[in-house]
């Protein structure tokens, strides 16, 4: 039996079942486990309930049950400056950001990791479904977990080698139903707690109302690609490429097909819409992404490779050819087949079989040489 008692693991506990079971498993494996609850947002919800207070109460109950010390740390300032300001800035540019990716790289695996090191941690852990392996050269690789349905490598795609070397993923070889079974069998109060959804740390609230508190909305025209006015939008920031719901447009004499957002004209403050799921303006042959991050380290030379990619969570992998440019740390990604609703601001994530290679931020989508969507 391996003696882990001198290895300290600081577990980020959210008050959910996944991080609760992570802490439990590490404790059962003999590690010196410390639980820490992160407060990153003043998260009174739309009904006036402060969900952080309830979550922290659950953390305390779980920590007491499994017999570990626990603390609370406030990262609201760091979250505001490193994640939320970026989030707002992307919306101002007409893009659709993914704050969860930034939250992981800047808060959970940076601010929290630094705090854990001050607690003399050897490793940190949370409730993510991901897996790492270390090769013979001591390089750590990010891998898909057992539960493909809960795979969170997409959201971890911009972590560095230094960050993932310090992480243990206790749920790597478990499915979500198994995690709930373990929680139930061990009497954890979080066993039947529903999964959190919504923006990282901000949670489930009326998104349009929430965003309008920070960015003034400016209504404008909804137009077809030919320039015909067909309606009015409530503010470009509220819409994303490929969106169908919430446009308030009906069928026309020419077609009963539903309408979709196919672009945004920022200068004219116009939302470009077209009927039909298969609108050619929704299909890209390639994209450009920047600020690339690779788990095994930043390459020092240009390269070309064929692999698979995702440009949104829960998307099936698609075949791509990647051309990396070392001088500005960008990639041009060519799709094997035209890809629908590639959205600037979202994360591009690259895979080679079961391994997650890394990712970056999508800047633009193209149909051959024509840039789509943002004009």
From Swiss-Prot:
Stated family? Belongs to the MnmA/TRMU family.
Q: Does the keyword DNA damage apply?
A: no
Q: Which InterPro entries match?
A: MnmA-like, MnmA-like_C, MnmA-like_central, MnmA-like_central_sf, Rossmann-like_a/b/a_fold
- Name the record gives this protein: tRNA-specific 2-thiouridylase MnmA
Q: Where is this site: Interaction with tRNA?
A: 128, 346
**What does the UniProt function comment say about this protein?**
Catalyzes the 2-thiolation of uridine at the wobble position (U34) of tRNA, leading to the formation of s(2)U34.
Q: Spell out the residue ranges making up region: Interaction with tRNA.
A: 150-152, 312-313
- Recorded GO CC terms: cytoplasm
The record's GO molecular-function terms, alphabetically, read: ATP binding; tRNA binding; tRNA-uridine 2-sulfurtransferase activity
Q: Where is the active site?
A: 103, 200
Compartments where found: Cytoplasm
Starting at the broadest rank, the lineage of the source organism is: Bacteria, Bacillati, Bacillota, Bacilli, Lactobacillales
Q: Which reaction does it catalyse?
A: S-sulfanyl-L-cysteinyl-[protein] + uridine(34) in tRNA + AH2 + ATP = 2-thiouridine(34) in tRNA + L-cysteinyl-[protein] + A + AMP + diphosphate + H(+)
- Which NCBIfam families does its entry note? PRK00143.1, trmU
Pfam families membership: tRNA_Me_trans (PF03054), tRNA_Me_trans_C (PF20258), tRNA_Me_trans_M (PF20259)
Residues given in the record as ATP binding sites: 12-19, 38, 127
Q: What is its main location?
A: cytoplasm
* GO biological process terms on file: tRNA wobble position uridine thiolation
The record's annotation in PANTHER family points to: MITOCHONDRIAL TRNA-SPECIFIC 2-THIOURIDYLASE 1 (PTHR11933:SF5), TRNA 5-METHYLAMINOMETHYL-2-THIOURIDYLATE -METHYLTRANSFERASE (PTHR11933)
Coiled-coil annotated spans? none
Which pairs of positions does the record mark as disulfide bonds? 103-200
């Amino acid at each position: 039996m391996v003696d882990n008692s001198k290895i300290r693991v600081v577990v980020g506990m959210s008050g959910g079942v996944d991080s609760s079971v992570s802490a439990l498993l590490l404790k059962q494996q003999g590690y010196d486990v410390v639980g820490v609850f992160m407060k990153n947002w003043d998260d009174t919800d739309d009904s006036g309930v402060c969900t952080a207070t309830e979550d922290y109460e659950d953390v305390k109950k779980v920590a007491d049950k499994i017999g570990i010390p626990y603390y609370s740390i406030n990262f609201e300032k760091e979250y505001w400056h490193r994640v939320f300001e970026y989030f707002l800035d992307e919306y101002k540019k007409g893009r659709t950001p993914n704050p969860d990716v930034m939250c992981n790289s800047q808060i959970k695996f940076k601010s929290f990791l630094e705090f854990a090191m001050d607690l003399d941690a050897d490793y940190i852990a949370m409730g993510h479904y991901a897996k790492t392996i270390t090769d013979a050269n001591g390089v750590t690789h990010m891998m898909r977990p057992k539960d493909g349905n809960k795979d969170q490598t997409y959201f971890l795609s911009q972590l560095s080698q230094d960050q993932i070397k310090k992480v243990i993923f206790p749920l790597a070889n478990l499915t979500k139903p198994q995690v709930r079974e373990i929680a139930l069998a061990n009497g954890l109060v979080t066993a039947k707690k529903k999964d959190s959804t919504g923006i990282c740390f901000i949670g489930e609230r009326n998104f349009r109302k929430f965003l309008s508190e920070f960015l003034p909305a400016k209504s404008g025209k909804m137009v077809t690609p030919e320039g015909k006015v067909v309606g009015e939008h409530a503010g470009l920031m509220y819409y994303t490429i490929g969106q169908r719901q919430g446009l308030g447009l009906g069928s026309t004499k020419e077609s009963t097909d539903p309408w979709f957002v196919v672009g945004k004209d920022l200068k004219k403050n116009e939302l470009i819409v077209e009927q039909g799921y298969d609108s050619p303006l929704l299909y890209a042959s390639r994209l450009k992404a920047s600020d690339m991050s690779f788990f095994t380290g930043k390459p020092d030379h240009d390269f070309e490779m064929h692999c698979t990619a995702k440009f949104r969570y829960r998307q099936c992998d698609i075949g791509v050819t990647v051309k990396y440019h070392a001088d500005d740390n960008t990639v041009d990604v060519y799709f094997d087949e035209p890809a629908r609703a590639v959205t600037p601001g979202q994360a591009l994530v690259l895979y080679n079989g079961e391994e997650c290679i890394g990712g970056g931020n999508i800047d633009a989508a193209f149909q051959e040489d024509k840039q789509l969507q943002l004009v």
